[in-house]
Curated annotation (Swiss-Prot):
The keyword Membrane does not apply. Its main location: mitochondrion. Coiled coil: none annotated. It comes from Mus musculus. HAMAP family: Ribosomal_uL13 (MF_01366). InterPro entries: Ribosomal_uL13, Ribosomal_uL13_bac-type, Ribosomal_uL13_CS, Ribosomal_uL13_sf. Pfam families: Ribosomal_L13. Belongs to the universal ribosomal protein uL13 family. Component of the mitochondrial ribosome large subunit (39S) which comprises a 16S rRNA and about 50 distinct proteins. Interacts with OXA1L. This is Large ribosomal subunit protein uL13m. It is found in: Mitochondrion. The gene is Mrpl13.
Length: 178
């Protein structure tokens, strides 16, 4: 193979790709795993811990993330101002109302390695609460990553034919009153 034909392959290996990830109805931890792998460049053959070869990740719909169970009220985020009596705690619901991208940002920040590259990797993360993406970012996008979990269908999204075709466990008699 000549060096002329290897040049595009090498360029594609070292180039910074832009990935789109939809956060609608997805748990923040699952989004963080996918995003941290792309931000670190773990998917590239030239990956090394000391090299900065990660890609850009754009996450949309962070306002519509989903927690399982009662985590909106039970999960607590803590911080300290550094002053006496400056310990602060907020639940996930309070933090999400205040800043819709903060929960996903903190989840990804916690997944990245604790070294000097961490803040550089976070600069390549672009979070948006809705589907509105600036035009300059939109033109750079290369690939849309699959969602980690299948999004369930809401009850009002089913057609009447699908409802009638659904198998019934029990059919009430005509004179049955509720």
């Amino acid at each position: 193979m000549s060096s002329f034909s290897r040049a595009p392959q090498q360029w594609a290996t070292f180039a910074r790709m832009w990935y789109l990830l939809d956060g609608k109805m997805q748990p923040p931890g699952k989004l963080a795993v996918i995003a941290s792998n792309k931000l670190q460049g773990l998917n590239k053959p030239v990956y090394h811990q000391l090299s900065d070869c990660g890609d850009h990740v754009v996450i949309i719909n962070t306002r519509h993330i989903a927690f399982s169970g009662n985590k909106w009220e039970q999960k607590v985020y803590s911080s300290h101002t550094g002053y006496p009596g400056g310990f602060r705690q907020v639940t996930a619901a309070q933090l999400h109302r205040k800043d819709p991208v903060a929960i996903v940002k903190l989840a990804i920040y916690g997944m990245l390695p604790k070294n000097l590259h961490r803040r550089t990797m976070m600069q390549r993360l672009h979070l948006f609460p809705d589907e509105d993406i600036p035009e300059d970012i939109l033109k750079n996008l290369v690939e849309e990553l699959p969602q980690p979990r299948r999004v369930p269908k809401r009850l009002d999204e089913y057609t009447q034919e699908e409802i009638e075709a659904f198998p019934r466990v029990w059919t009430p008699p005509d004179d049955f009153r509720m």
